[in-house]
Every structure is written in structure tokens, then in C-alpha cells.
Amino acid sequence: VGKQLEWIEKLFLNHYSKELLKKKMVKKVILAKNVTYCYRLGSNDLAERERDYFSNIANTLIFSHGDASVEDLTNEDLFEIKNDLHKWMLTEKLVDDYPVAELEDFLSVTDYSKTLSADYYEEWMAEGWLGRLANSEEAAKSEDIRTYVEMIITTPREMLEIDVNSISYPDPLFWVIRDYDYAGFLHPSMDVAGNIKKKYDLIVAAFKDWGVDLPVIGELYYE
């Protein structure tokens, strides 16, 4: 359990202030061995599905690997766990607590009226908009913040800045970049107007002032 708590702190808890954790963290954290849950099949039989890393149930966060298996977790495993945990924390639990006032400059870059019509689809990336067709400007702003947060915490800077158009098979990176939804988004070939990089810098600064270093989370366990 000691080793398990150590990696939970390193990949998750240590990246948030005590105030944020006290305010938004689940009421109970359980360090378990193997977390599984069951669901009924069409035949009414019970099927068991293993949750490899963690589960959030009834305001309780339950972690697996409370035994010797924690020693077998690879960097790839830890990178995946890290992404899932921080996406849950930063794009679900903390949404209502985002530092909105500090994000005004970030939100001023994009003309959100263009996110409401597919007629502007070809302009979206130039506007710094990474989402899909929005229902309203307010909804677009909320989605925009969450999308940038997800991009930064799940994608190392090296992958964000890579020129995906210059990589082809059999370059080993050809397969690596396929694991990253946001690969190349900060490269000029995709960020043609520089607005994605501009918004990247603004949201990183706003969240850092808030006490969360998004790029540090993005680099964690990246090889």
C-alpha cells in the first residue's frame, strides 16, 4: 500500500493545492488490490470487467494495484493512468472552479460566433478553435477551455510541436504520433495563424497562477 500511495501522490495528488483537494476531491480514497465491477449481459448472466487502475463510484475513488503488481506498472501504464485521472479531475470535477476571470485573454482570441456554423469550418483552426460545431457561444467557451486543458495534460510539448506531415512509415514516430490526438497542433503547419500557441500560453499562465501546472502534468511519465 505504501508504494501504491507513493505513485498516486506523484502522478496525481501532488499536482493540486491542498485547498483544491479539500474543496473538490472525493470524500473517500480506497487503496485496493484489484478493482472490478459486474454488469448484466443480454442473457441476464453477470459479466465481470476488470478496472486496471481506478474507479470513481459514489464519491469514492478506488485505486487498484495495492499489491506487488504496482512494481510491474510501466511508464506507458503510468502515462495512461495519469491522463485518465487528470482528465477526470480537470475536465469534470474542477470545471465549476476554473479561474474564469484570468481566462478572459484566452477567450478573447477566438471569434466564437464562427463555432456555431459549419460554414466557417476551414477557419476554425486559424481561430484557435479545436472543438466541433457548438450550440451556443457560452457552450463553445466552456468546451474550449476543457479542450485546451485536455490537450496540454495529455500531450507532451515535443508531440505538440512535431511536424506530423514530415513523418512517414517506416519512421518509428509514425506509430508514436498515432497515440496522440493533438500531435502537431502547435506546429506552424497546423497552427497557421499562431492562435493555438497564443491560447496555449495564456491558459498555461492562468492555470499556473491558479496553482495547477498543466505542462508539467503533460510531461509526466513521457519517454
Please provide the spans of the model-predicted regions.
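Structured domain cores in non-transmembrane regions
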Residues: G42-D52, L61-D72, K198-E219
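Auxiliary, metal-adjacent structural segments of Zn-dependent hydrolase domains
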Residues: G2-N59
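Active-site recognition of the HExxH zinc-binding catalytic motif
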Residues: A58-Y112
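Metalloprotease/metallohydrolase-associated module, dominated by Zn2+-dependent proteases
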Residues: T110-E223
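Extracytoplasmic/secreted proteins, especially bacterial periplasmic and envelope-associated proteins
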Residues: K3, W7, K24, E80, ...
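Short glycine-rich, low-complexity/disordered patches
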Residues: N14-L31, P99-E104, L214-Y222
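Sec-exported extracytoplasmic/periplasmic mature domains
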Residues: E9, L13, S17, H86-V95, ...
